[in-house]
C-alpha cells in the first residue's frame, strides 16, 4: 500500500533512458512512481528495480499517441490516489532527420502527436489532480534543438516539436502562477548516453557523453515541494536555471 505521505509521480517514457533514470531517482526519494511506456516487458523490469529499492510503482502500458487513453488516465489516477504531485513529460521520439521540404507528412504528424499533443492532453487530463496536490510540480524534458541561436539543419520536425513543447510548458506556468501551487519547469538534458542520441549521432563515442542518471540527479529536485520557481529552463550542460529572453 502506498504511504499517504508519498509523492505520486507520473513519468512518461519511463521504461528506458532518461525516463527510466528519472523514475528510479524519484523512487529513491520515496515517490510512488506511475510509470507510463509502450512496452510491458520493459515496464516490468523497471518495476523490479523500483521494488529492489524498497519503492512502489504503478505500471501504465500506453502509447502516447493514444489520446483517448491519456484522457482516461486522469480519471483512473483520481479514483486511486485522489491527486497527482508530479508530472514528468519525458516521452518523445526523434523522427527522421531530413530537410523540411522532404519530410513525410505521416512522420511529421507522428512526431507532433507524441512530442507536442500528448503533453497537452496530459495537462488537460491531469491538471485537476495537480491542483489537488499541496505542491503540484510539472517537468517537461526539452532539447537544445528547440532554442539554438542558429537552428541546426535537418532536425526540423524534432526541433519544431520541442519548441512547441516549450511554449506549452511556459503557457501552463503562466496560467497556474496565480491560481494554484503548481510549478512548471523545463529541463534540457543536452547530449546524453541514450538510444535516441545514438540514432541521431551514430558515429559518436557514447563513452564521451554524460549519463541519464547524472541528469536525473539534477532534474528530480525540480519536482520537489521545495522548488518554487516556475516557467524557467534548467540547462544541464551549463548547470544553470535560465530565463527565456525576448528577441533583441
Q: What is the predicted function of each stretch?
A:
Residues 93, 131, 137-178:
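Catalytic loop of short-chain dehydrogenase/reductase
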Residues 29-45:
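Conserved glycine-rich Rossmann-like NAD(P)H-binding loop of the short-chain dehydrogenase/reductase
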Residues 6-7, 55-56, 83-84, 130-143, ...:
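Active-site loop of short-chain dehydrogenase/reductase
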Residues 15-17:
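Conserved glycine-rich cofactor-binding loop
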Residues 178, 182, 186-187, 194, ...:
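C-terminal helical subdomain
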Residues 41, 61-72, 105:
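The beta1-alpha1 cofactor-binding region of Rossmann-like NAD(H)/NADP(H)-dependent oxidoreductases
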Residues 98-100, 107-110:
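Substrate-binding pocket helix/loop in short-chain dehydrogenase/reductase
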Amino acid at each position: 500500500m502506498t504511504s499517504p505521505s508519498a509523492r505520486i509521480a507520473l513519468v512518461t517514457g519511463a521504461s528506458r533512458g532518461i525516463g527510466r533514470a528519472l523514475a528510479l531517482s524519484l523512487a529513491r526519494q520515496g515517490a510512488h512512481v506511475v510509470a507510463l511506456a509502450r512496452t510491458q516487458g520493459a515496464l516490468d523490469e523497471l518495476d523490479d528495480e523500483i521494488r529492489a529499492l524498497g519503492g512502489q510503482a504503478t505500471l501504465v502500458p500506453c502509447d502516447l499517441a493514444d489520446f483517448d487513453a491519456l484522457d482516461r488516465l486522469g480519471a483512473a489516477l483520481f479514483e486511486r490516489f485522489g491527486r497527482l504531485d508530479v508530472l514528468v513529460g519525458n516521452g518523445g521520439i526523434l523522427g527522421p532527420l531530413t530537410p523540411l521540404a522532404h519530410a513525410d507528412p505521416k512522420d511529421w504528424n507522428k512526431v507532433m502527436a507524441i512530442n507536442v499533443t500528448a503533453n497537452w492532453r496530459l495537462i488537460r487530463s491531469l491538471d485537476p489532480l495537480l491542483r489537488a496536490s499541496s505542491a503540484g510540480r510539472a517537468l517537461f524534458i526539452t532539447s537544445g534543438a528547440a532554442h539554438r541561436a542558429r537552428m541546426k539543419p535537418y532536425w526540423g520536425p524534432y526541433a519544431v516539436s520541442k519548441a512547441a513543447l516549450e511554449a506549452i510548458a511556459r503557457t501552463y506556468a503562466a496560467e497556474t502562477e496565480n491560481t494554484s501551487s503548481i510549478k512548471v519547469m523545463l529541463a534540457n538534458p543536452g547530449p546524453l548516453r541514450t538510444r535516441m542520441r545514438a540514432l541521431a549521432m551514430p558515429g559518436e563515442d557514447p563513452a564521451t557523453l554524460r549519463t541519464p542518471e547524472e541528469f536525473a540527479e539534477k532534474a528530480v529536485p525540480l519536482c520537489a515541494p521545495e522548488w518554487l520557481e516556475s516557467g524557467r529552463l534548467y540547462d544541464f550542460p551549463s548547470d544553470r536555471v535560465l530565463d527565456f529572453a525576448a528577441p533583441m
